[in-house]
UniProtKB/Swiss-Prot annotation:
Cysteine disulfide links: none
Organism: Paenarthrobacter aurescens (strain TC1)
Protein purpose: Produces ATP from ADP in the presence of a proton gradient across the membrane. The gamma chain is believed to be important in regulating ATPase activity and the flow of protons through the CF(0) complex.
Signal peptide range: none
Any single GO CC term annotated in Swiss-Prot or TrEMBL for this entry: proton-transporting ATP synthase complex
Protein name: ATP synthase gamma chain
Record InterPro entries: ATP_synth_F1_ATPase_gsu, ATP_synth_F1_gsu, ATP_synth_F1_gsu_CS
């Protein structure tokens, strides 16, 4: 009986230590979410401005730019999958990968090859475990992405988009990431990045109609300069949204783990007390039995 009590004490001690760790990680994630949301908000003015600029150029010109022209036949699609580097975030990465699997199945059903580009060690481990190939992978800092990483990703995707199919190029680019809606709601999302669909944002109201411009130098040169910046901004925005979603998911997961640890501590405490009472009862019974034996 005494050994059983010691086991419960050890379980209570270890679970209490784990609860402290969960609480610390929850507080860290909570503090970082505010910074992540602020970065998302800070990126919006630039993203909106460059989106308006690209829309103005593309809608007011009749040129066939490679990044805005729909190919006659789409044979290979690139899929950029943004996950996390670390775990302890609930089903965050699993949800993104499930969404990516659904997109991959859809593209295969349309007769398209799929070329994967991965962000985050979770996506890399997922593909490695299944012996599936991928073109590129970027790891490190998924919960605090840097614009330089988005530039590198954008450059790699644009390079393959500009390459012929026979040389391993792609005809369209999709991005799978988690959109941050609120602290309790994050939604796995798919967007098609290229070829650029000019009318892909919500329709502007009459007061927001784009004015007419005359472009210097030529419109094609303006697009050549703007579109890479536009692609980088869209990728960076997706990475920032994913980072905020990852931290929110981790905060919820750690809170849930802490609550479960509290329940376990209560359970083990109750079992320990029951075992202690049983031990005391047994000792009293032995004392009474011994006294009766002496009296007789």
């Amino acid at each position: 009986m005494g050994a059983q009590i010691r086991v419960y004490r050890q379980k209570i001690s270890s679970t209490t230590s784990m609860r402290k760790i969960f609480k610390a990680m929850e507080l860290i994630a909570t503090s970082r979410i505010g910074k992540a949301r602020a970065r998302v908000a800070a990126s919006l003015p630039y993203a909106n401005a460059i989106t308006r600029a690209v829309s103005a150029v593309a809608t007011q010109s009749e040129i066939d730019h490679p990044l805005t022209t729909e190919p006659e036949q789409i044979r290979r699609a690139a899929v950029l999958i943004i996950t996390s580097d670390r775990g302890l975030a609930g089903s965050y990465s699993a949800s993104v990968l499930k969404q990516a699997e659904g997109l991959t199945e859809l593209l295969h059903a349309e007769g398209k090859e799929v070329k994967a580009y991965l962000v985050g060690r979770k996506a890399q481990a997922y593909f490695d475990f299944r012996n599936r190939s991928y073109a590129r992978v970027w790891t490190g800092g998924t919960d605090a992405p840097e614009f330089e990483t988005a530039q590198e990703v954008g450059a790699a995707l644009l390079e393959d988009f500009s390459t012929d199919f026979e040389e391993g190029g792609v005809d369209e680019i999709h991005v799978v990431y988690t959109r941050f809606k609120s602290m309790v709601t994050q939604e796995p999302t798919v967007i098609r990045l290229l070829p650029l669909e000019v009318v892909e944002e919500e329709a502007a109201s009459e007061s927001e109609l784009l004015p007419l411009y005359e472009f210097e130098p030529e419109t094609e040169q303006v697009l050549d300069a703007l579109l890479p910046r536009y692609i980088e901004s869209r990728i960076f925005a997706a990475m920032l949204q994913a980072a905020a979603s990852e931290l929110a998911a981790r905060q919820r997961a750690m809170k849930s783990a802490g609550d479960n640890a509290t329940d376990l501590i209560k359970k083990y405490t109750r079992l320990r007390n029951t075992a202690r009472q049983a031990e005391i009862t047994q000792e009293l019974s032995e004392i009474v039995a011994g006294a009766d034996a002496l009296a007789s």
